[in-house]
Amino acid sequence: MPEKNSTWTPQDPVIELRGAHVVHKSRTGSLLRPDKVHAVNDVSLTVRRGETLGLVGESGCGKSTTARLMVGLQAPTAGEVYFKGRRLGHRASDRRALGRSVSMVFQDPATALNPRMVVHDTLIDPLNVHGIGSPREREAKVRDLLHLVGLPPSALDVLPRQISGGQRQRVA
């Protein structure tokens, strides 16, 4: 369980990185001294409720690694990640709590959607994983989401390659 912080309020940061570092061991170098790749070096930032954060930079600068830190998919080598004032640990329960509230939206919908899953399954999967609502409520939520982005109900039964790029973006 993450460390408790009972003083968190909705005005405080939802996600906070403090001096986050991620270092990967490379396959080059020797067995006892592998080369290291510094993917993220001393990143500190906060995101408050209702804010949207875009990470922009050149290829290989650490955007994806920083995003993975923020949504709990990557643990920092050093530094700390906080969610609603609680320090995130390395347990799956910590990541699940974060995953219910925070997500990444990828720029390219071709890579964001599983090409083997129909739109319905893509949309309902996170609701199933997090146990949100009853099965009937989940189905209603999926239909509501589709309506919200202006897609017809028939779009639920198609694979991503069967809809236009703009429609894929709206699904993603």
Identify the function of each model-found stretch.
Residues 71:
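Helix-to-loop junction immediately C-terminal to a conserved catalytic motif
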Residues 56-57:
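The feature captures the beta-strand-to-loop junction immediately N-terminal to the Walker
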Residues 29-34, 87-103, 121, 129, ...:
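ABC ATPase NBD coupling module
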Residues 137-154:
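Conserved ABC ATPase "signature" region
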